[in-house]
């Protein structure tokens, strides 16, 4: 995400394509997450698809923002619409926010894809199951689902 001169990145657990025409992606973010304010103000975001085996990178961007610049230690460039693009990723997409929808304790943010690039055609994408539950979501599921 980007707004004015501020850039940030976070690991999103849920990202999906929702339309071909126009090409739309959706991501889910906790509205109490510090990145949500930047996303709302900047109205743009990038999706950087991590490669299988880049768990340390996912963990780095999954930690709370705080005063440190999470982008400082990584190679990145600025995209056409000002959002950070990770040069180590498998692929990236630049998106303009076109809508939001409340979804329980998260918000679904809809983005129109403005640009994208495949950086490594031989790599496989990281899947959520490879993260080992680093977001702690498995602890939130009830032992038994009721009515």
Segments (PLM) and residue ranges:
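Basic, polyanion-binding surface patches
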Residues: 1-147
């Amino acid at each position: 995400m980007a707004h004015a001169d501020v850039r940030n990145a976070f690991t999103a657990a849920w990202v999906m394509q929702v339309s071909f025409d126009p090409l739309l992606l959706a991501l889910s973010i906790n509205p109490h997450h510090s990145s949500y304010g930047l996303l709302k103000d900047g109205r743009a975001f990038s999706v950087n698809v991590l490669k299988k085996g880049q768990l340390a990178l996912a963990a780095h961007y999954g930690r709370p923002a705080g005063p440190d610049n999470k982008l400082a230690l990584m190679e990145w460039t600025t995209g056409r619409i000002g959002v950070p693009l990770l040069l180590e990723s498998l692929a990236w997409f630049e998106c303009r926010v076109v809508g939001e929808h409340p979804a329980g304790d998260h918000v679904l943010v809809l983005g129109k894809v403005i640009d994208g690039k495949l950086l490594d055609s031989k790599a496989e994408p990281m899947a959520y199951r490879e993260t080992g539950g680093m977001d702690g979501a498995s602890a939130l599921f009830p032992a038994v689902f009721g009515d």
